[in-house]
Swiss-Prot record:
Pathway: Isoprenoid biosynthesis; isopentenyl diphosphate biosynthesis via DXP pathway; isopentenyl diphosphate from 1-deoxy-D-xylulose 5-phosphate: step 1/6. It is an enzyme of class 1 (oxidoreductase). The gene is dxr. 1-deoxy-D-xylulose 5-phosphate binds at K124, S149, E150, S174, H197, S210, N215, K216, E219. PANTHER family: 1-DEOXY-D-XYLULOSE 5-PHOSPHATE REDUCTOISOMERASE, 1-DEOXY-D-XYLULOSE 5-PHOSPHATE REDUCTOISOMERASE, CHLOROPLASTIC. InterPro entries: DXP_reductoisomerase (IPR003821), DXP_reductoisomerase_C (IPR013644), DXP_reductoisomerase_N (IPR013512), DXPR_C (IPR026877), DXPR_C_sf (IPR036169), NAD(P)-bd_dom_sf (IPR036291). This is 1-deoxy-D-xylulose 5-phosphate reductoisomerase. Keywords: Isoprene biosynthesis, Manganese, Metal-binding, NADP, Oxidoreductase. GO terms for biological process: isopentenyl diphosphate biosynthetic process, methylerythritol 4-phosphate pathway involved in terpenoid biosynthetic process.
Length: 384
């Protein structure tokens, strides 16, 4: 009997690659539900191929259009956050993959976990802003399976080990497209240039985050919650080749690394086949062809977003909520050419400076602070 899969954000980068992997594993999985924002054309193609029982469009108008397009099919079309929560909570789901981008992913994450579903988490913002709310679920083995390549690597490396055996986690960062670009030229960076990631095929927002190193900062906070490690035990190393996805140093000072080609289909597949490994679509890694691997310390003067993320995580409470919300607004402003690339961390820092931390937030607190930070960030971007 095939297992049933729900994919939130099926038209995005992780979502489309998930469906590609699922086609490779079609003897094991079937699609129960898919969701998208407003890409009706692509989700129609996905619906006709995978024949899900449910489809969700965040955009109400797009939902109406999709209903019309699929009038010859039996799939039920839902809309909005209510629709996302509904499909995240389906009892018959064997796995819910949250591949949404941004804070919109939090409520579906909470819904999936509260309903008892296993969660494949690519939406790092769920943990960044909601870590205090959902951390109790993270202690249940196999309930949250990380999709991010770095956290998926650590998840595999820690298999068979307990927290007391871990000395530190080492997250690798490519350094993005501007690793060697002088800081004084950041103000001249174009959106087109920032969207050219040297190694990974990702969506627009996460590619910009990679260019500022904010993506790695968000991943540090995510790792803190996923693996129950204090921030001083989570290090970042710049590794331009993106061959080593992460490392773990144990108390005996041995270091184990997870390596492979820069292909998101590998961690996605592991989430779908956990705890087994099967043949994948990824290219075999040939180290002799590569020839060398390089490493360097991240420059937090040149890339202050990483430092801001550490500060937000260490301050805790609602500060990571502010960090994430301000970053989303600043990145959007840059992508719409309202601010220059170098102003992204400036906006974030100014909003963080104005925040009064709530130390033990509930879901309502998180939503309220998220809204406040977005409004404040929009004000700040208008002043830059």
């Amino acid at each position: 009997m095939k297992k049933k899969l729900v994919v939130l954000g099926s038209t995005g980068s992780i979502g489309t690659q998930t469906l590609e992997v699922l086609s490779h594993l079609e003897d094991q999985w079937e699609i129960l539900a898919l969701s998208a924002n407003k890409s009706t054309g692509l989700i129609e193609k996905q619906a006709r191929k995978f024949k899900p029982r449910y489809l969700v469009m965040m955009n109400e108008r797009a939902a109406l259009e999709l209903k019309h397009r699929l009038s010859d099919m039996s799939s039920e079309v839902l809309s909005g956050m209510e629709g996302l929560i509904t499909i995240s909570s389906l009892e018959e789901a064997d796995l819910v993959i949250n591949a949404l981008v941004g804070a919109v992913g939090l409520k579906p994450t909470v819904a999936a976990l509260q309903s008892g579903n296993t969660l494949g988490l690519a939406n790092k913002e769920s943990l960044v802003i909601g870590g205090e709310i959902i951390k109790s679920y993270l202690n249940e083995e196999g309930r949250v399976l990380p999709v991010d390549s770095e956290h998926n690597a650590i998840f595999q490396l820690l298999n068979g080990h307990n927290d007391k055996e871990v000395e530190r986690l080492i997250l690798t960062a490519s350094g993005g497209p501007f690793l060697e670009l002088p800081r004084e030229r950041f103000k001249d960076v174009s959106v087109k240039d920032a969207l050219k990631h040297p190694n990974w095929d990702m969506g627009g927002k996460i590619t910009i985050d990679s260019a500022t190193l904010m993506n790695k900062g968000l991943e540090v906070i995510e790792a803190h919650y996923l693996f129950r490690q204090p921030y001083h035990n989570i290090n970042v190393v710049v590794h331009p080749e993106s061959i080593i996805h992460s490392m773990v140093e144990f108390v005996d000072k041995s270091v184990i690394a997870e390596m492979g080609s820069a292909d998101m289909r590998m961690p996605i597949q592991y989430v779908l086949t956990y705890p087994r490994k099967v043949k994948s679509l990824a290219k075999r890694l040939d180290l002799t062809e590569l020839g060398y691997l390089t490493f360097k310390k991240p420059d937090t003067v040149k890339f202050p977003a990483l430092k801001l993320a550490y500060e937000a995580g260490q301050q805790g409470g609602t500060m990571p909520v502010v960090l994430n919300a301000a970053n989303e607004i600043a990145v959007s402003a840059f992508m719409n050419e309202k601010i220059t690339f170098d102003k992204i961390p400036v906006v974030i820092e100014r909003v963080m400076e104005n925040h009064q931390i709530i130390s033990s937030p509930d879901l309502e607190d998180v939503i309220e602070v998220d809204n406040w930070a977005r409004a404040r960030a929009k004000e700040v971007t208008g002043q830059c």
